[in-house]
């Protein structure tokens, strides 16, 4: 049975469960004092090379974005173009997002301490919230200025400088898209190759179809590495942001070209400003949604808690699961707590070990608190 394999396969846990000499009470319960589960998650799952590569790419992107943003701010003032300034504000939101991703990678190596027992993972959420506030503040100032100009219509815009600055931004974003896109497509090629091998093996193991369907419920992650997935998500997110920035720069460049040819059409600059400001504000809504979900301690979006509960009930010795709670400390750092009523004669220690292994291998939950009740 797949279930038996999940409960038995625990190469790292056996050493952890036996290492420090616990008290008799702890031995009877099957609970041994351990280091923070999130610390073990980082050491067990993440790969140093993957982290270093993500850090290098994100740092390079931040540096390039700061260069483009600085040029756009200076050029925006020179051209008296709010559309260029809005483009710079959108870049500011990207820099803030990349800094949060970089902070998340950095914070993952910080150890928990007695006063911060969950570690410093939620700093990522606080940093994201502050970056969103900064974006809304800057966008609000630009929108206010655009409305003032619409009412007065007294400002002139240098279309030539506006076109040149936005063309520079478009070119730099194109370079970043091509650079990140190479890594993005390479990652998907590897994934496709793995999927092809899986199909090939599936044809040679037709008799195991039923067992695999049961495992789908018991092991939905199917061996995915959560840390590597998280690193790839950071890079893919940066790729999508670069694509959006390139499209926005193209829009501003077209607006600059129109004003360059028709200097009186200053309204084009203000329309671009309002449209792209709304675009920048809309881009923060998914971030706010994630922040709200984490602070409200909701079940992670991609997790089916009913399927999780059914999987827990399939573990040997488990009769009833109740008071099941699942929430996130930050993105990808999941905590679980539950009460279990065991079958008569079942070992609490084996149940706890089985639940912990199931949560870790099937859902990437490294911090599970399990209370086995007596009837």
UniProtKB/Swiss-Prot annotation:
Q: Where are the transmembrane segments?
A: 58-78, 85-105, 123-143, 161-181, 241-261, 265-285
Which regions of this chain are Vacuolar-facing, per the record's topological domains? 79-84, 144-160, 262-264
What protein name applies here?
Answer: Metal tolerance protein B
Q: Where is this region: Required for zinc-binding?
A: 182-206
The domain of life for this entry's organism is: Eukaryota
The chain's Cytoplasmic topological domains, given as residue ranges, are 1-57, 106-122, 182-240, 286-375
Which is a GO BP term held by this UniProt record?
zinc ion transport
Free-text function comment from the UniProt entry: Involved in sequestration of excess zinc in the cytoplasm into vacuoles to maintain zinc homeostasis.
**Would I find Hydrolase among this entry's keywords?**
no
Its encoding gene is what? MTPB
Q: Which organism is it from?
A: Arabidopsis thaliana
PANTHER family given in the database record: CATION EFFLUX PROTEIN/ ZINC TRANSPORTER, METAL TOLERANCE PROTEIN B
Q: Which InterPro entries match?
A: Cation_efflux, Cation_efflux_CTD_sf, Cation_efflux_TMD_sf, CDF/SLC30A
User: How does the UniProt record describe the way this protein sits in the membrane?
Assistant: Multi-pass membrane protein
- Keywords, in A-Z order: Ion transport, Membrane, Metal-binding, Transmembrane, Transmembrane helix, Transport, Vacuole, Zinc, Zinc transport
């Amino acid at each position: 049975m797949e279930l038996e394999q999940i409960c038995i396969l625990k190469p790292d846990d056996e050493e952890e469960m036996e290492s420090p000499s616990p008290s008799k009470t702890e031995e009877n319960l099957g609970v041994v004092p351990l280091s923070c589960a999130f610390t073990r998650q980082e050491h067990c799952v993440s790969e140093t090379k993957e982290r270093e590569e993500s850090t290098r790419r994100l740092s390079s992107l931040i540096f390039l974005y700061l260069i483009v943003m600085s040029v756009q701010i200076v050029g925006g003032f020179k051209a008296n173009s709010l559309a260029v300034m809005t483009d710079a504000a959108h870049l500011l939101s990207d820099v803030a997002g990349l800094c949060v991703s970089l902070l998340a990678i950095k914070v993952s190596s910080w150890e928990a301490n007695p006063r911060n027992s969950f570690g410093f993972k939620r700093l990522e959420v606080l940093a994201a919230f502050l970056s969103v506030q900064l974006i809304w503040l800057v966008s609000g100032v630009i929108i206010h200025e655009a409305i003032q100009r619409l009412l007065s219509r007294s400002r002139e815009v240098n279309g030539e400088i506006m076109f040149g600055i936005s063309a520079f931004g478009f070119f730099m974003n194109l370079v970043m898209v091509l650079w990140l896109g190479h890594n993005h497509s390479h990652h998907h090629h590897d994934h496709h190759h793995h999927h092809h091998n899986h199909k090939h093996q599936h044809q040679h193991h037709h008799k195991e179809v039923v067992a695999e369907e049961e495992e789908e419920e018991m092991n939905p992650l199917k061996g995915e590495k959560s840390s590597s997935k998280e690193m790839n998500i950071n890079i893919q997110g940066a790729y999508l942001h670069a694509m959006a920035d390139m499209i926005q720069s193209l829009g501003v460049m077209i607006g600059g070209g129109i004003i360059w040819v028709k200097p009186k059409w200053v309204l084009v600059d203000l329309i671009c400003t309002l449209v792209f400001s709304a675009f920048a504000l809309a881009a923060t809504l998914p971030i706010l949604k994630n922040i709200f979900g984490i602070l409200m301690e909701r079940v992670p979006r991609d997790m089916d808690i009913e399927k999780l509960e059914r999987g827990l009930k399939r573990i040997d010795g488990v009769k009833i699961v109740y008071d099941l709670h699942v929430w996130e400390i930050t993105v990808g750092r999941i905590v679980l707590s539950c009460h279990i009523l065991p079958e008569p004669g079942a070992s609490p220690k084996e149940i706890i070990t089985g639940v912990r292994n199931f949560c870790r291998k099937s859902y990437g939950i490294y911090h599970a608190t399990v209370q086995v009740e007596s009837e």
